[in-house]
Amino acid sequence: LEFRRVLFRSQADVIVAAGLRFNWILQSGAIIPPSAKVVRIDIDPHEIDRNRMADVGLVGDVGSVLSQLTPLLNQRDHSGWIETLRAASSSLLDYEIRMRANPSDPIHPLRLVARIQEFAGEDALYIADGGDTVYFGITGFSSRHRAGVIGTASGLLGCLGTGIPFAMAAKLARPERKVILLNGDGSMGFNAMEFDTMVRHNIPIVCVVNNDCAWGMIKHSQELSLGKERLQCSELGLRHYEKMVEGLGGYGELVTSDDEIVPALERAVASGKPACINVITDPTVTSPATPLFYQSLRMDQ
């Protein structure tokens, strides 16, 4: 939250948007402090004043323009601002490190990611699909391979629910490597029946469901806007995806405690089948991405 406050509620007097579109993620520009001067750099002249008028507009290739502006930065002392950003980033990083090392139940999603990484190592290929689940995955997984960590919902064209087909493609392209899919329980519902395809065509990925029994990002956004007593259509309840996968001929296992995670993963890989490890995680946890998502959808700012 401190990281969000510094970056998006700062007292910055000038903001340089280099090739950045003022779309819904930035509340069409409304998330920028009204007092700030805005410099926009874009190769497309139509973007310069889109959604928010620029105080200074520079039309051109971002790389070329910035290479001309960079020498000017050395003329001013930015050390104070840099330290502010470093402190905010360090605060968030410290929190993530503590949660990865926390073995208590209910399982924190970052702890789940740490356990998966402990098991599969840097030779595996990782895909993260969902809302908060994508954040937890891409910040926690590490792979030595190019494109070894993929978040399906990244950017404007990221598509919820594509984790399963992404994982299938990764396993077909690199059958010798472990392919681990971290799936939210909401995103699991989009293409879960493709486990039938995986069984028939022998595509043994391991899908780990980060199951908080909800559309987590939506639920926590509703808590921010409506309160915990007025949740609408965001609670999913416990669904036994592991049993569905077993019914299709794959391997399934339910996990409810930290010490069960790695043994379950070992059994999943040893089965040689497409596998689903359904892990019940802490339903109260959200990621720093959720407040940003909530702010981006607010129309009163």
Each PLM stretch: what is its role?
Residues 1-7:
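Short, small-residue-biased leader/transition segments that mark boundaries at the very start
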Residues 89-165, 298:
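Active-site diphosphate/adenylate-binding microenvironment
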